[in-house]
Amino acid sequence: MHANWKTWAHVTKLDPDKRLPPGAAEEIATSGTDALMLSGTLNVTQENLNELLDQVSPYGLPLVVEPASPDCAIFDGRIDHLFVPSVVNANDVRWIVGKHYTWLRHANSIDWDMVVPEAYIVLNPNSAVGRVTGADCALSCRDVAAFVEVADRYFRFPIVYIEYSGRYGDPSIVQAASDAVEHAVLYYGGGIRSAEQAAEMGRIADTIVVGNAVYDEGIDVLRATVRAVQ
């Protein structure tokens, strides 16, 4: 039985390219977060992804892999879901559908019960994901709402993900996305480093994702962001 990702309020994102200090995996897994997402834009390999899985899988928390390339789209008995992103505001079609085609063209088999497609709207042009995908980040509230409607109502993505990637976002933009979404679960990620920021975005989005704070601020801040939304 796969974990019910639709009910999660707080997800912690861990980057396989970043090292966790000794004991950190257990502290993160027992912080109260609903799930762990293993995800990164640069320098993610099967080797460092599996190393991180080895660290976090013993604690029984739901695990998601979010692959940045077909090589890391793995089906592993330790993970619950594969969240596969399409950057819908990318200027390079490879990040919308091209890499997905490559993955399916060469895959031996796909466990579709594990796959959850995500419509990413990337809004930080200075982030790695913004640069790599060539995302058009200069979007108004109406622009974002239109992308949400395309993703949610036309393409029927089950997740719409507002991604500021390392920078705290504009609540009015996230509110516009929330107002536009009808069916999908709305995720927000980017720059959450305090309980106050977690609470603010948690009131708008269905699920908040906390990532860099784990490495930069430490476990106490992570726990505070969990308490703010649960």
PLM features: what roles do these ranges have?
Residues 1, 12-13, 17, 113-115, ...:
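Alpha/beta catalytic cores of nucleotide-metabolism and tRNA/nucleoside-modifying enzymes
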Residues 1-63, 136-156:
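Conserved N-terminal beta1-alpha1 strand-loop-helix module at the mouth
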Residues 8-14, 36-38, 63-65, 82-84, ...:
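Hydrophobic faces of well-ordered beta-strands that scaffold small-molecule active sites
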Residues 24-25, 65-84, 177-210:
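Catalytic cores of alpha/beta
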Residues 37-99:
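Metabolite-binding pocket within alpha/beta catalytic cores that recognizes anionic/polar moieties
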Residues 38-43, 81-96, 164, 190-192, ...:
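Glycine-rich phosphate-binding active-site loops on the catalytic face of alpha/beta enzymes
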Residues 50-56, 97-100, 106-107, 212-230:
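C-terminal helical cap(s) of enzyme catalytic domains, especially alpha/beta-barrels
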Residues 72-158:
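Conserved anion-binding
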